[in-house]
Amino acid sequence: MASPQELACVYAALILQDDEVAITGDKIATLLKAANIEFEPFWPGLFAKALEGVDVKNLITSVSSGASAGPAQAAAAAPAGGAPAAAAPAESKEGRRSQGESDDDMGFGLLD
């Protein structure tokens, strides 16, 4: 889990990107000081160095569009597979049930 200092640096970098300002350690530190956030002095420089040469706006838009395109691509590919693709999940469900039932018979209990 990210620390509050890390999250503050991320938000500061996003604010700078939204305002189309170059992301530097000094500017991140200035934003954090203006927000009265206590932070270790290495965090702003670390985030600025990590984001150096990275188009943050493009990164954000490509991540969000990739997540929404995934289900659409899967739905488009499903009709091409036809009935054999539909039969495979039914077999795997039956296999899971029999495997789950066999695990129940083993007698392993938490408090035995």
Swiss-Prot record:
Biased composition range(s): Basic and acidic residues: 91-100
Keyword Cell inner membrane: no
Xref: CDD domains: Ribosomal_P1
Compositional bias ranges of the Low complexity kind: 71-90
Protein's UniProt keywords contain Transmembrane helix: no
Superkingdom field: Eukaryota
Gene Ontology biological process terms, A to Z: cytoplasmic translation; translational elongation
Molecular function GO labels: protein kinase activator activity; ribonucleoprotein complex binding; structural constituent of ribosome
Any one annotated GO CC term: cytosolic large ribosomal subunit
Keywords for this protein: Ribonucleoprotein, Ribosomal protein
Gene3D superfamilies, per database record: 1.10.10.1410
Spans annotated as Disordered: 71-112
Pfam hit, one: Ribosomal_60s
Family: Belongs to the eukaryotic ribosomal protein P1/P2 family.
Stated role: Plays an important role in the elongation step of protein synthesis.
Oligomeric and partner information: P1 and P2 exist as dimers at the large ribosomal subunit.
Protein's UniProt name: Large ribosomal subunit protein P1
Taxonomic source organism: Oscheius tipulae
